């Protein structure tokens, strides 16, 4: 069992919570700077741990909200930062609209590797109350989120995130600045929701994207033919693979075939 102690508080590291604590203050300063946080923002920090990032945010504004699942760490943060609102629980079940109130949220966090995708999709679902999110995560996932067409990392995650948010890879973080040290490097990205939703049916678009990438090396024609009536679509784009399409091309194709879904089709099959 790995234990970490800080300011007379010791915890047994829980792998299922993805607990790797950042120790380099230069990096926390850089994260806060990149987030463009200002004193008037409604700020939410995901998983403060021992408060490395919390400390930097509090130099800008002493009052904000943090969500911490580990009871011992939640207690530690309450004692160290009495002006904060500490929500002890799972971020995935938290009501973000209640936290935001009348102002959009600026979210920061060193998020657990194991639940990175659920966190990202929760933020995506709540994008209308999101000002920005500046997040540290596994380096490989950061590359997948910010990937460009015709690259090996460009896939479902890139298209779904970039369709509704401006995403940016900010900087890499080596594994040696964490306790305990993870087996991979991390990276920090930013995501800012687009002003207007490019498609009205996000769930339908999501199904379409998953179907388009179902077998990565196959053409769109082959991946989509069981789900949509493609004989009614005149588009040379169907001869391409999903990884070759830009986000705008995904939008245009979706608008063409959206009404043509086969009623009995299962997009995941």
Swiss-Prot record:
GO terms for cellular component: cytosol. S-adenosyl-L-methionine binds at residues 20, 22, 47, 68, 90, 110. It is found in: Cytoplasm. Its EC number is 2.1.1.182. It comes from Chlorobium phaeobacteroides (strain DSM 266 / SMG 266 / 2430). HAMAP family: 16SrRNA_methyltr_A. This is Ribosomal RNA small subunit methyltransferase A. NCBIfam families: ksgA. InterPro entries: KsgA/Erm, rRNA_Ade_diMease-like_C, rRNA_Ade_Mease_Trfase_CS, rRNA_Ade_methylase_Trfase_N, rRNA_adenine_dimethylase, SAM-dependent_MTases_sf. Keywords: Cytoplasm, Methyltransferase, RNA-binding, rRNA processing, S-adenosyl-L-methionine, Transferase. It comes from the Bacteria. The keyword Methyltransferase applies. It holds the Pfam family RrnaAD. Coiled coil: none annotated. Specifically dimethylates two adjacent adenosines (A1518 and A1519) in the loop of a conserved hairpin near the 3'-end of 16S rRNA in the 30S particle. May play a critical role in biogenesis of 30S subunits. Belongs to the class I-like SAM-binding methyltransferase superfamily. rRNA adenine N(6)-methyltransferase family. RsmA subfamily. One of its GO terms (molecular function) is RNA binding. It is an enzyme of class 2 (transferase). CDD domains: AdoMet_MTases (cd02440). The gene is rsmA. It catalyses: adenosine(1518)/adenosine(1519) in 16S rRNA + 4 S-adenosyl-L-methionine = N(6)-dimethyladenosine(1518)/N(6)-dimethyladenosine(1519) in 16S rRNA + 4 S-adenosyl-L-homocysteine + 4 H(+).
